[in-house]
Amino acid sequence: GRFVPVSPTPAAELPDAEFPMVLITGRVLEHWHTGTMTRRSFVLDALDPEPWCGMHPDDLARVGVASGERVALETRRGRIKLEARADEGVAPGSVFMAFCYHEAAANLLTQPKLDPFGKIPEFKFCALRVEPA
């Protein structure tokens, strides 16, 4: 193989005044992929049974909620409510959410625009606003 240079392209949707934060979706240790297998395991589901999002403590304070309280996450496509947890590992201005919880389905919020070459949806990055629930 060989390396081929590419030019980075911006995300289909960037933060703005109305939706000033970034939603990042991903996996958590206890629940792999969409949780279809791991959420059936009573032991694993007991470790992380409820939907949650991770936010930097400064962002939680700016929104006016404490770790463990509920927030509403809203994008141009949808709105869900879930617990917010303080996480200094999440960059300020970003919100991390696992996509394994059907009760608060992350893809109700995500950007469906397809990459022009790979035809992969842009599920990992979209503009978001957070409010107390």
Model-derived features with residue positions:
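Long, low-complexity segments enriched in small/aliphatic residues
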Residues: 1-43
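Long, contiguous, secondary-structure-rich segments that constitute the structural scaffold
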Residues: 18, 34, 39-54, 58-133
